[in-house]
Amino acid sequence: PYESSDVPDEGYPDGLILKCAVKELKKLKAQKKPFFLGVGFFKPHLPFNAPKKYWDLYDRSLIPIASDPFIPKNVHPNSVGKMGEFYNYKLSDEKPTLDQSVSDVYARKLIHGYYASVSYIDHLIGELLLELKSLELDKETIVVLWGDHGWHLGNDRKWGKHSLFERSLKSALI
Protein backbone atom coordinates (compact mmCIF):
# COMPACT_ATOMS: atom_id res chain seq x y z
CA PRO A 1 0.00 0.00 0.00
CA TYR A 2 2.90 2.39 -0.67
CA GLU A 3 5.08 3.58 -3.50
CA SER A 4 7.90 6.06 -3.99
CA SER A 5 8.64 7.02 -7.60
CA ASP A 6 11.10 9.61 -8.81
CA VAL A 7 8.47 11.66 -10.65
CA PRO A 8 7.28 15.29 -10.49
CA ASP A 9 4.25 16.16 -8.37
CA GLU A 10 2.02 15.66 -11.42
CA GLY A 11 3.19 12.04 -11.58
CA TYR A 12 0.43 11.20 -9.10
CA PRO A 13 -3.27 12.15 -9.18
CA ASP A 14 -3.07 14.81 -6.48
CA GLY A 15 -0.49 16.77 -8.48
CA LEU A 16 -2.86 16.67 -11.45
CA ILE A 17 -5.70 17.84 -9.22
CA LEU A 18 -3.61 20.85 -8.22
CA LYS A 19 -2.89 21.60 -11.88
CA CYS A 20 -6.63 21.53 -12.67
CA ALA A 21 -7.44 23.68 -9.63
CA VAL A 22 -4.92 26.35 -10.69
CA LYS A 23 -6.40 26.38 -14.20
CA GLU A 24 -9.89 26.74 -12.75
CA LEU A 25 -8.79 29.57 -10.42
CA LYS A 26 -7.54 31.53 -13.42
CA LYS A 27 -10.89 31.09 -15.18
CA LEU A 28 -12.81 32.10 -12.06
CA LYS A 29 -10.69 35.22 -11.58
CA ALA A 30 -11.40 36.30 -15.16
CA GLN A 31 -15.15 36.17 -14.44
CA LYS A 32 -14.73 38.92 -11.81
CA LYS A 33 -17.51 37.67 -9.57
CA PRO A 34 -17.74 35.64 -6.35
CA PHE A 35 -17.00 31.95 -6.69
CA PHE A 36 -16.74 28.67 -4.82
CA LEU A 37 -14.09 26.14 -5.69
CA GLY A 38 -13.79 22.81 -3.93
CA VAL A 39 -10.45 21.04 -4.35
CA GLY A 40 -10.32 17.47 -3.07
CA PHE A 41 -7.00 15.71 -2.65
CA PHE A 42 -6.80 11.95 -2.12
CA LYS A 43 -3.80 11.72 0.15
CA PRO A 44 -3.06 10.69 2.79
CA HIS A 45 -5.53 7.90 1.99
CA LEU A 46 -4.11 4.57 0.91
CA PRO A 47 -2.14 3.77 -1.04
CA PHE A 48 0.67 5.84 0.47
CA ASN A 49 2.01 6.93 -2.92
CA ALA A 50 4.01 10.12 -3.20
CA PRO A 51 6.93 11.40 -5.25
CA LYS A 52 10.31 10.24 -3.94
CA LYS A 53 11.34 13.74 -2.84
CA TYR A 54 8.72 13.60 -0.07
CA TRP A 55 9.93 10.20 1.11
CA ASP A 56 13.45 11.62 1.16
CA LEU A 57 12.41 14.18 3.77
CA TYR A 58 12.45 11.44 6.42
CA ASP A 59 15.06 9.03 7.70
CA ARG A 60 13.06 5.83 8.14
CA SER A 61 15.34 4.58 10.91
CA LEU A 62 14.36 7.62 13.02
CA ILE A 63 10.61 7.31 12.53
CA PRO A 64 8.94 6.47 15.83
CA ILE A 65 6.54 3.55 15.96
CA ALA A 66 3.36 3.39 18.03
CA SER A 67 4.00 3.24 21.75
CA ASP A 68 0.66 1.46 22.24
CA PRO A 69 0.52 -1.33 19.60
CA PHE A 70 -2.00 -3.42 21.51
CA ILE A 71 -5.77 -3.63 21.78
CA PRO A 72 -6.83 -1.73 24.90
CA LYS A 73 -8.09 -3.82 27.82
CA ASN A 74 -11.82 -4.35 28.23
CA VAL A 75 -12.55 -3.37 24.64
CA HIS A 76 -14.81 -5.62 22.61
CA PRO A 77 -13.02 -6.72 19.41
CA ASN A 78 -15.96 -5.58 17.26
CA SER A 79 -15.42 -1.97 18.33
CA VAL A 80 -11.83 -2.18 17.14
CA GLY A 81 -13.03 -2.78 13.59
CA LYS A 82 -11.34 -4.50 10.70
CA MET A 83 -8.43 -3.29 8.59
CA GLY A 84 -10.09 -3.77 5.23
CA GLU A 85 -8.11 -1.04 3.51
CA PHE A 86 -4.92 -3.03 3.92
CA TYR A 87 -6.49 -6.32 2.84
CA ASN A 88 -7.44 -4.85 -0.53
CA TYR A 89 -3.76 -4.76 -1.47
CA LYS A 90 -1.77 -7.76 -2.59
CA LEU A 91 1.15 -7.29 -0.28
CA SER A 92 4.46 -9.02 -0.48
CA ASP A 93 5.13 -7.63 2.98
CA GLU A 94 3.33 -8.41 6.20
CA LYS A 95 -0.40 -7.99 6.64
CA PRO A 96 -1.49 -6.35 9.86
CA THR A 97 -4.00 -8.30 11.93
CA LEU A 98 -5.69 -7.78 15.27
CA ASP A 99 -4.03 -10.97 16.50
CA GLN A 100 -0.45 -9.97 15.83
CA SER A 101 1.45 -6.70 15.50
CA VAL A 102 3.54 -6.10 12.40
CA SER A 103 7.31 -5.94 12.73
CA ASP A 104 8.95 -2.65 13.65
CA VAL A 105 10.61 -2.58 10.21
CA TYR A 106 7.28 -2.85 8.40
CA ALA A 107 5.58 -0.42 10.79
CA ARG A 108 8.25 2.18 10.00
CA LYS A 109 7.79 1.57 6.26
CA LEU A 110 4.04 2.22 6.51
CA ILE A 111 4.46 5.27 8.74
CA HIS A 112 7.14 6.56 6.37
CA GLY A 113 4.62 6.31 3.53
CA TYR A 114 2.01 8.16 5.57
CA TYR A 115 4.48 10.94 6.41
CA ALA A 116 5.50 11.26 2.75
CA SER A 117 1.84 11.44 1.69
CA VAL A 118 1.07 14.14 4.26
CA SER A 119 4.14 16.15 3.21
CA TYR A 120 3.12 15.83 -0.44
CA ILE A 121 -0.34 17.21 0.24
CA ASP A 122 1.03 19.91 2.52
CA HIS A 123 3.23 21.07 -0.37
CA LEU A 124 0.33 21.00 -2.85
CA ILE A 125 -1.89 23.03 -0.52
CA GLY A 126 0.97 25.51 -0.15
CA GLU A 127 1.21 25.77 -3.95
CA LEU A 128 -2.53 26.40 -4.18
CA LEU A 129 -2.30 29.17 -1.57
CA LEU A 130 0.64 30.75 -3.43
CA GLU A 131 -1.43 30.70 -6.61
CA LEU A 132 -4.28 32.47 -4.82
CA LYS A 133 -1.79 35.14 -3.78
CA SER A 134 -0.21 35.49 -7.24
CA LEU A 135 -3.70 35.94 -8.74
CA GLU A 136 -4.44 38.54 -6.03
CA LEU A 137 -7.37 36.48 -4.82
CA ASP A 138 -5.94 35.81 -1.36
CA LYS A 139 -7.38 38.92 0.34
CA GLU A 140 -10.99 38.08 -0.48
CA THR A 141 -10.91 34.30 -0.37
CA ILE A 142 -11.89 32.07 2.53
CA VAL A 143 -9.91 28.84 2.61
CA VAL A 144 -11.26 25.90 4.61
CA LEU A 145 -9.23 22.72 5.06
CA TRP A 146 -10.70 19.54 6.47
CA GLY A 147 -10.06 15.85 6.66
CA ASP A 148 -12.69 13.14 6.62
CA HIS A 149 -11.28 10.93 9.39
CA GLY A 150 -8.29 10.19 11.57
CA TRP A 151 -5.84 7.37 11.07
CA HIS A 152 -4.28 4.60 13.13
CA LEU A 153 -0.58 4.02 12.52
CA GLY A 154 -0.21 0.89 14.59
CA ASN A 155 -1.87 2.40 17.64
CA ASP A 156 -4.30 0.06 19.37
CA ARG A 157 -2.93 -2.63 16.99
CA LYS A 158 -4.81 -0.87 14.19
CA TRP A 159 -3.75 0.28 10.77
CA GLY A 160 -6.28 2.43 8.97
CA LYS A 161 -9.43 4.29 9.84
CA HIS A 162 -12.21 1.83 10.62
CA SER A 163 -12.77 1.86 14.36
CA LEU A 164 -14.75 3.62 17.04
CA PHE A 165 -11.60 4.97 18.68
CA GLU A 166 -11.08 8.72 18.84
CA ARG A 167 -7.98 8.40 16.67
CA SER A 168 -10.20 7.26 13.77
CA LEU A 169 -13.19 9.47 14.43
CA LYS A 170 -11.29 12.71 14.95
CA SER A 171 -10.85 14.83 11.83
CA ALA A 172 -9.14 18.15 11.19
CA LEU A 173 -10.96 21.39 10.38
CA ILE A 174 -8.83 24.47 9.79
Regions found by a protein language model. Name each.
Residues 1-16, 24-33, 38-140, 144-174:
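Active-site-proximal cap/lid insertion segments
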